[in-house]
Amino acid sequence: MRFDTVIIGGGLSSLVCGIRLQKAGRKCLIVSSGQNALHFSSGTFGLLSRLPDGTPVDRPLKAMDELPSGHPYSKIGIEAVRSYLAQVPPFFKDCGIELYHGADEEANGYRMTPSGSLKPAWFSLTDNTLNSSADVRFEGKALIVNFAGFLDFNTSFVAAGFEKRGASCRIETVRHPAVERLRVNPSEMRSVNIARVMDREDNWKQFVNLVKEKMHGEEMVILPEVFGFGNPSVMLWICEMIPAKVIFVGTMPPSVPGMRAQLLLKKAFEEAGGTFLPGDEAVSAEVEDGRISCIRTANLGKVRLESDCFVLASGNLFGKGLVTTPERVYEPVFGLDVEYPSDRTLWYDSDFSSRQEYLGFGVRTDSSFRALRGGEVVPNLFVIGSELAGCNTLAEGSGAMVAILSALKVSDEILQ
């Protein structure tokens, strides 16, 4: 089988790249092995919250001047980063996903996490409340409502986070008949299953009535982010019907807004004419005259997937885009050059909460994100997303936007 572009990986970066190329007339194939990081996404997209040395960042665009030359943002260039950032909201809107930025165009916004802390973000789905400052205050009384038996929304943590910032919180649980049926099997009490139940109009309206019964004049009502899986408008309707300011706070994974975003992006790719190959993974490649001529997958066996261009977006260690042994780290499909320290004791920190260097391992590329193999550029193989060397996206809080911006950059390179 032959395509204009074959993309390996089914996550955020591969879908953005595939949609962009497909809409430009390229015949694209995405090979996806399964779940991706969007399933664990909060529904917010971070641009940069810390420099590599750990310095907190409030104004990411200004701070990018301090990034090393090998960082993906440095390779894209600050002016191109600004241009791509302006393209992101309309791009996602065309896919059925509404994004917004905080009040200050140059600064990070801040969202409340399931642990009750504030985390920086650049863009947010409309599901989330993006606060303009890390010093935000929540004055007044707040009612935190959870479903009985739903353990992935820790109301005590959430209450502590809001009370630390001025709110007076009260916690209540509700027993919704449709959700109670899920409790027969404890493994079914997960955010996505509740969200599917709450997609029904009679169910979410009944939930609103249960919340109203628990209210005693609170100015704020805080709810778990388990609504709008099939239709995000449900959240707007809930906000309209509850006589207080409604704040949705994310739950522990799986993430309802993240999974909805993944489904909408996949739908946009397929509606544009792209081919999505789920439940499969690239296992080998053939190289001719320094160029990739084809790949083979686990399920298709001897069938050659040929293309003019290949894009590697299979993630780092999380997505099996990189593989480790006690002695080395390698890229398993193409044998690409991987950047990592030879001293294994430098791969990790014994303090779990500290910066973990192994999360910054990645494939070496040139300034256009073409992969390096044996020190030589592979002209028709590009790398995007978290598989790129030069950044530790988890420590920097840059994962989503590195994925999106590198995908936009590479799609432009391919279309030139």
Question: How should these model regions be labeled?
Answer:
Residues F3-I30, S411:
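N-terminal Rossmann-like FAD-binding beta1-loop-alpha1 element of flavoenzymes
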Residues T5-I8, L29-V31, A282, R304-N316, ...:
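Short hydrophobic core segments
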Residues G34, P257, N299-K302, S307-C309, ...:
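Glycine-/small-residue-rich beta->alpha transition segments that form the dinucleotide
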Residues K266, V283-R304, F310:
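Conserved beta-strand-loop-beta-strand element in the redox core of flavoprotein oxidoreductases
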